[in-house]
């Protein structure tokens, strides 16, 4: 195994230590079935975090995916409520997710405005659209739209060969996005765009087309997450993705992505998703209040960002310390 997987190995070791530590507090944490099936509570965050990694590698950001999930979820409910067959409703929901991503990409490309500002705007646009649809359908905030076929609501709660379906879909997404980013020419273009967009343009790399693909994949993954969440909870609500933003970005940064673009790892993000997810699960099983666990997740994000920054600039830090040692302050 090449040395470039060192960060991923460190994350994997940290994941094992985390599980063992929580297992010492609550032995249920060491039960394999509990570990596998508890992923259904957070693995949709990972499905979105994987393409989000590629967006961040390209030097962009998308903070609207939580609202995209809510919009796609309520759209699925409205379509079903209107009599659209379930397979067609799911297909249209997936197309809606991809369209949301393309809207983000189009606005970023043609306005030249910072992606953070654009996706902050579309976050409110998609969230407002979801609330509008929900109100038109007569759905309440907590109950949402229900009455889905049992075959659909059972889907996200099934298991195949002992693995829950949401985890299997996450693993399929992991394989697809890893192959695309790390093993294709288009994936290498993403790294080049993140390192220097101007050089990428002069190198005849299709920057705009690549960005459209990245944001569309994030929107599509958001729609997949929405379908799984509606199936899992049996209800389509506009707030289903509202809490996904911080854990997803934490997983991407913890997984090794440079927030300024140019580097990142799909496998690292996948391991980090499990790390963050099991952290929340372990804290809950240890009886820690949700407010405290959320604060710890925020602290983890800060520590990771600072740690990665120190790691990226360690040579400059060493030189600065050497200068201070040679020229101490009077």
Swiss-Prot record:
Disulfide-bond pairs as recorded? none
Q: PANTHER family, per this entry?
A: ABC TRANSPORTER PERMEASE PROTEIN YPHD-RELATED-RELATED, AUTOINDUCER 2 IMPORT SYSTEM PERMEASE PROTEIN LSRD
Q: Which InterPro entries match?
A: ABC_transp_permease (IPR001851)
- So where does this one cross the membrane? 5-25, 43-63, 68-88, 89-109, 116-136, 160-180, 210-230, 238-258, 259-279, 286-306
How would you describe this protein's topology in the membrane?
Multi-pass membrane protein
GO molecular function per UniProt: transmembrane transporter activity
* Record's subunit section: The complex is composed of two ATP-binding proteins (LsrA), two transmembrane proteins (LsrC and LsrD) and a solute-binding protein (LsrB).
Protein name (database record): Autoinducer 2 import system permease protein LsrD
Q: What does this protein do?
A: Part of the ABC transporter complex LsrABCD involved in autoinducer 2 (AI-2) import. Probably responsible for the translocation of the substrate across the membrane.
Q: Which domain of life is it from?
A: Bacteria
Which keywords appear in this protein's UniProt record, sorted alphabetically?
Cell inner membrane, Cell membrane, Membrane, Transmembrane, Transmembrane helix, Transport
Q: Which family is this sequence assigned to?
A: Belongs to the binding-protein-dependent transport system permease family. AraH/RbsC subfamily.
User: What gene is this protein a product of?
Assistant: lsrD
| Cytoplasmic topological segments | 1-4, 64-67, 110-115, 181-209, 307-330
Query: Where is the protein found, in the record's own terms?
Result: Cell inner membrane
């Amino acid at each position: 195994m090449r040395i470039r997987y060192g960060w991923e190995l460190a994350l994997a070791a940290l994941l094992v230590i985390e599980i063992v530590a929580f297992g010492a507090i609550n032995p249920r944490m060491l039960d394999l079935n509990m570990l596998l099936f508890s992923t259904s509570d957070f693995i949709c965050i990972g499905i979105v975090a994987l393409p989000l990694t590629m967006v961040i590698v390209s030097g962009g950001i998308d903070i609207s995916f939580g609202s995209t999930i809510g919009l796609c979820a309520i759209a699925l409910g409205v379509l079903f409520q209107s009599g659209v067959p379930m397979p067609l409703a799911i297909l249209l929901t997936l197309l809606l997710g991809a369209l949301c991503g393309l809207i983000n990409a189009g606005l970023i490309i043609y306005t030249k405005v910072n992606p953070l500002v654009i996706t902050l705007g579309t976050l409110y646009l998609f969230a407002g659209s979801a609330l509008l649809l929900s109100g038109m359908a007569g759905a309440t905030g907590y109950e949402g739209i229900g009455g889905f076929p049992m075959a659909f609501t059972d889907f996200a709660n099934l298991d195949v060969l002992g693995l829950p379906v949401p985890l299997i879909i996450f693993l399929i997404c992991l394989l697809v996005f890893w192959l695309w980013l790390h093993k294709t020419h288009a994936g290498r273009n993403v790294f080049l765009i993140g390192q220097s967009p101007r050089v990428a343009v002069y190198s005849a790399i299709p920057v705009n087309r690549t960005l459209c693909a990245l944001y569309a994949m994030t929107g599509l993954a958001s729609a997949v997450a929405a379908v799984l969440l509606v199936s899992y909870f049996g209800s389509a609500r506009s707030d289903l993705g509202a809490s996904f933003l911080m854990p997803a970005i934490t997983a991407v940064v913890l997984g090794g992505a440079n927030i300024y673009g140019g580097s990142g790892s799909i496998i690292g993000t996948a391991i980090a998703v499990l790390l963050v997810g099991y952290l929340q699960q372990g804290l809950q099983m240890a009886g820690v209040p949700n407010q405290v666990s959320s604060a710890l997740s925020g602290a983890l994000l800060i520590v990771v960002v600072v740690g990665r920054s120190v790691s990226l600039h360690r040579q400059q830090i060493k030189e600065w310390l050497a200068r201070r040692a040679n020229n101490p302050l009077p």
